[in-house]
Design a protein with these regions (language model features):
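Active-site nucleophile elbow and catalytic-triad environment of alpha/beta-hydrolase enzymes
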Residues: 159-175, 190
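Conserved alpha/beta-hydrolase "acid-adjacent" motif
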Residues: 192-197
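Conserved HGGG/HGGXW glycine-rich cap/lid loop of the alpha/beta-hydrolase fold
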Residues: 14-63
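Flexible "cap/lid" loop of the alpha/beta hydrolase fold
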Residues: 102-110, 116-144
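Catalytic histidine neighborhood in serine/cysteine hydrolases
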Residues: 205-219
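Catalytic histidine-centered segment of alpha/beta-hydrolase-like enzymes
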Residues: 216-225, 229
Length: 244
């Protein structure tokens, strides 16, 4: 299908890049930390048959810039609500991976009326929800890029991304209880997010379903897209989000 590319200007002058294709109700795809919308290259060809798919480069990622000296999830959530307004949408379904899932959760708490359904692939609201070695690696990267940014200015942007992984999202357990839309928590058997935390999310969100795929890791959608895509479509079909 025909794909269109756009830049959406935010009130602070930041330009958010996104690609749009397909027909049907809107589906936002939100990538993980340090990545871009290209992560979903194996999802778009199928999903665009059922949805108008918006593949978004989050602020400071991919082709999107950031005019602010900081980066956090509420700021990124505000970008999404601006994009929704500019596209004249009322509400959207969101599929988020890793930090994209965290962003989807923050967005759902801040703008609950804008969310039809959620697919949360390997998200975590607390840093403690990620396995120790992954947090250790993020901390090591933080030190490396902090030292490097004195000599290479562009490392400052990388620092802001890494800090996202080393701070809690700001979503509380009580706020999870208030998420009213149908939600799928989907993770790999060998995920970076602990099983305990993923089950906690599924238990805390009233209309949540939980899928844990054997043989898969944090990058399930990229490693085994056919399986991942069918799980997502089956869920969205079950809650009435897939157009016949």
């Amino acid at each position: 299908m025909k794909k269109e590319a756009f830049y959406s200007q935010m009130p602070d002058g930041t330009e958010i890049y996104y690609e749009k294709s397909g027909v049907g109700e809107p589906l936002f795809l939100l990538h993980g930390n340090g990545d871009s919308g290209g992560y979903f290259s194996h999802q778009v060809p199928l999903f665009e048959k059922y949805f108008t798919v918006y593949v978004i480069d989050s602020r400071a990622h991919g082709k999107s810039n950031n005019t602010q000296p900081y980066l956090d999830f509420p700021l990124m959530a505000d970008d999404l609500v601006q994009l929704i307004a500019q596209e004249s949408l009322s509400d959207v379904t969101i599929l988020g991976f890793s930090d994209g899932a965290n962003l989807a959760l923050v967005f759902s708490v801040l703008y609950p009326q804008k969310v039809r359904a959620l697919v949360l692939n390997s998200g975590n609201i607390f840093v403690s929800g990620v396995k120790f070695w992954a947090n250790w690696w993020s901390s090591a990267q933080l030190i490396w890029f902090w030292l490097g940014h004195f000599f290479i200015p562009k490392y400052q942007q990388k620092l802001s991304m890494i800090r996202l992984m080393l701070h809690d999202s700001g979503v509380s357990e009580s706020q999870l209880h208030q998420i009213a839309c149908p939600t799928l928590i989907i993770v790999g058997y060998r995920d970076l997010v602990t099983l305990r935390h993923s089950k906690f999310l599924a238990r805390s969100i009233p209309q949540a379903s939980f899928v844990r795929m054997k043989g898969e890791n944090h990058f399930y959608a990229r490693r085994n897209p056919d399986s991942f895509n069918q799980e997502v479509l089956a869920f969205l079909n079950s809650v009435g989000e897939v157009e016949k």
